[in-house]
Amino acid sequence: MTMTLHTKASGMALLHQIQANELEPLNRPQLKIPLERPLGEVYMDSSKPAVYNYPEGAAYDFNAAAPASAPVYGQSGLPYGPGSEAAAFGANGLGAFPPLNSVSPSPLVLLHPPPQPLSPFLHPHGQQVPYYLENESSGYAVREAGPPAYYRPNSDNRRQGGRERLASTSDKGSMAMESAKETRYCAVCNDYASGYHYGVWSCEGCKAFFKRSIQGHNDYMCPATNQCTIDKNRRKSCQACRLRKCYEVGMMKGGIRKDRRGGRMLKHKRQRDDGEGRNEAVPSGDMRAANLWPSPIMIKHTKKNSPVLSLTADQMISALLEAEPPIIYSEYDPTRPFSEASMMGLLTNLADRELVHMINWAKRVPGFVDLALHDQVHLLECAWLEILMIGLVWRSMEHPGKLLFAPNLLLDRNQGKCVEGMVEIFDMLLATSSRFRMMNLQGEEFVCLKSIILLNSGVYTFLSSTLRSLEEKDHIHRVLDKITDTLIHLMAKAGLTLQQQHRRLAQLLLILSHFRHMSNKGMEHLYSMKCKNVVPLYDLLLEMLDAHRLHAPANFGSAPPEDVNQSQLAPTGCTSSHSLQTYYITGEAENFPSTV
């Protein structure tokens, strides 16, 4: 068998062709070089992938054009001689390249693949060469290079490092999931909350802003329409809207935990006491929730042992009569003539002081204090004006055509005309008072109706989908049934027949719907007076007004008078279900000064 020897010129041309095919752009999907015989011993087995790469330190100018004839090789790189042609090239035209240690760095070198692929060859200008040769069973093909993978000589260490990275990743993932459960966000700007400040979860920025606003200058003006977006990035753009949102989410001046008032000694004492029961201290947010919102177990236990359900009708009547608030006198000066501002000032001042006594009255209504704090506040916010109005109508029964706001403040319809929009409300109140007078309403029936208004005001929270519903609806319904049975007992005790009892009960309960209608009218009128700055509203009255706006439908107060400055429409009081918590927690309502 004879072996054809190639000349030096043909060998050089063949090498040039291989090099040009490797470096030319990818003009066709696959380049196959037919093989006539098995590869030499330097070539790898066809079942194993072979990677063409360039050793580190090799330099090659890719921008230089390839010569037309043949590339210039150093004599030390490819020593062609008469006796070396057969050793350098095989019969198939590809032959075996010289060993790597016998040649200088060349642009084309065949390397055996290490356990991990070598890092790809870097272009002299810092760009990665996007192609390498890969051996397949069908031949050699030019493929696009993948992302760089760096070779580590010790595969065992690499596996161990992978296990450590996997373990650390899983640990970090579990820690992240654990911390995500406890992550809280600021109710004002949605930034990460630093704690429970002024009654809500808030960040340090909103906490400091609210503190400055309630302690110093807070006469902010919105340059737009009091509807600026307050978030993490835009919370400093409008101080007026930021303060408005602080009040809307429930921030309040008195929203400070009791356990913070004693200073460091109380804190250490609390931690020491907690350490006796458990190793970890209770978080501040949980302490706040435990202080303000009774746990479900405590609530269930309280409802089970609630004494109101075991009261007789006579005991219920006695308790309601004893809970009645004291008589309050107004600051009316007979020597001063009435004007719109003076009359509204008298009425709002009187209403504000009545609200304080109303809170104490509600606490003494049987079954009311058994409710969760959220339910107590919610019911008062929904019913406060109805309760004031039914008290006004009851006092005015003996004064036809007049309304007895206080023992020293008796107004008729003509005097009510000095306040714009007041006559319509006057007429409705006078008509209801006349209806009570026709029915000869008794004092025992009056206290029952007033308690029904309180407990029934927020049972159906269909006015706003953003509010949290009542937590103790079942207990409220049971107390309402108890008071209704007391009403029926009073009618039976008065000698009415069963049919008369049913008719009178229906008539009394139907009148309550008129109080709801009058209350809505009164809220709209009070809100318009606030927008026109006719009279400054007092703290508690303002809070209750803003809270009622939060509970009311979206179109409530949406059309203020045209001459109203839009900057005055922002609520300046607390407009959440936490607006009365200050009076419950600190007992401020009990110590509030009043004129009796």
UniProtKB/Swiss-Prot annotation:
Record flagged with keyword Glycosyltransferase: no
Region Interaction with AKAP13, residue ranges = 263-596
Q: Where are the zinc fingers (NR C4-type)?
A: 186-206, 222-246
Region annotation (Interaction with DDX5) maps to: 36-175
Q: Where in the cell is it found?
A: Nucleus; Cytoplasm; Golgi apparatus; Cell membrane
- UniProt record similarity statement: Belongs to the nuclear hormone receptor family. NR3 subfamily.
- Please give the record's comment on domains: Composed of three domains: a modulating N-terminal domain, a DNA-binding domain and a C-terminal ligand-binding domain. The modulating domain, also known as A/B or AF-1 domain has a ligand-independent transactivation function. The C-terminus contains a ligand-dependent transactivation domain, also known as E/F or AF-2 domain which overlaps with the ligand binding domain. AF-1 and AF-2 activate transcription independently and synergistically and act in a promoter- and cell-specific manner.
Identify this protein by name: Estrogen receptor
Q: Which organism is it from?
A: Bos taurus (Bovine)
